[in-house]
A protein has these predicted regions:
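Blade/loop signatures of beta-propeller domains
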Residues: 30-42
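Short, solvent-exposed loop/turn segments at conserved positions within beta-propeller repeat blades
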Residues: 71, 159-166, 207-209, 255-256
Length: 319
């Protein structure tokens, strides 16, 4: 049974401090006493520098840190303290996010090319997902896998506050990722996506409305139950990429805020991790089996890392 596209229902928790900050200009919020109060002043270390608009970090089984360069069009790898270019699907490529498949391939969402894959051992590139019902995507952004290997990705570009036609898609693993289902269809630039440890729901960040949605899975038909707004954010242009730790805490990069929000399993913001410089925090990755959270920043093109309280979830590709 093919599920209907979910209509989003706006409910859920909205923190009091979000209401207070609603009247504060966004450029002032990142310096606000409230965000300073949320900071634990964790030491943040510089790992590497280079590239053009860094995004989509991931670790492979050998411990290599990969990422994408949105403006450069490259899938790249951190070597020492440098960002080294490895593969490009096309001169027109604009990769946005990346995730590791269990077979070793790296899946890349691309604003112009859909979803393509790279096999590090053979260096093979495959343009895997180009169209939905014969039509090109608006511009895929971020992605994640569930524990069955199904791929979820957001389709974000050309959408915004005045055109809430962004979407969340699922590509079925059993079909070789050829069977696509649109799960959500009315989002204002959907961005990050993640599945918590219990596997019963999926989070989707909606950048242009500065909030996250949580959508419970309806496992009877492979779709979703009605979604609800789980978190509103306090600064920046909106939520970008996310990662989740083994206890269900969400780490949310927020674009133009110079930092990362930490959200507890009850959807409350409990901490703001500020990076030393660069405002364009784009995405995150946990070093496998550790509490080290790696952060890409795209204004000054730095990779940072910070030690948090819990070990990160093990991605499906590393299980």
């Amino acid at each position: 049974m093919t599920p209907n596209v979910i209509r989003l229902i706006c409910r859920g928790s909205v923190a009091l401090i979000a209401a207070v900050l609603a009247v504060v200009p966004l450029h002032a919020v990142a310096q606000s006493p409230i965000l300073q109060m949320l900071s634990k002043n964790r030491p943040v270390e510089l790992v590497a520098k280079g590239g053009q608009f860094l995004e989509g970090p991931l670790f492979d089984r050998d411990g290599n840190l990969w990422l994408v360069e949105v403006l450069g069009g490259w899938l790249s790898r951190v070597e020492g303290d440098k960002v080294v270019r490895v593969a490009q699907a096309s001169p027109d490529s604009q990769p946005q996010g990346a995730a590791l498949h269990k077979d070793g391939r790296i899946f890349i969402t691309d604003r112009r090319l859909g979803v393509w894959t790279y096999e590090p051992k053979t260096k093979k590139i495959d343009l895997l997902i180009r169209y939905y019902h014969g039509q090109p995507f608006k511009g895929p952004n971020d992605l994640t896998f569930d524990d069955d290997g199904n791929l979820y990705f957001t389709d974000a570009w050309q959408t915004g506050v005045d055109d809430s036609s962004g979407a969340l898609f699922m590509a079925d693993a059993a079909s070789g990722y050829r069977k696509l289902t649109k799960l959500i269809g009315n989002l204002a630039m959907p961005n990050g996506v993640g599945i918590p440890p219990d596997g019963n729901s999926i989070y989707v960040s909606e950048l242009r409305k500065n909030r996250n949605w949580r959508c419970p899975f309806d496992k009877s038909n492979g779709g979703l139950f009605s979604c609800f707004v789980s978190t509103h954010f306090l600064s920046g242009n909106g939520p970008d990429g996310m990662k989740i730790d083994e206890k269900g805490f969400v780490y949310q990069a927020n674009f133009n805020s110079q930092g990362v929000y930490v959200i507890d399993p009850n959807h409350e913001i409990i901490e703001f991790i500020r990076i030393p410089r660069g405002r364009f925090t784009t995405n995150l990755a946990f070093k496998p089996g550790t509490k080290w959270l790696y952060i890409t920043e795209a204004q000054q093109n730095n990779v940072w890392r910070v030690e948090v309280d819990n070990i990160g979830m093990t991605p499906w590709g590393l299980k």
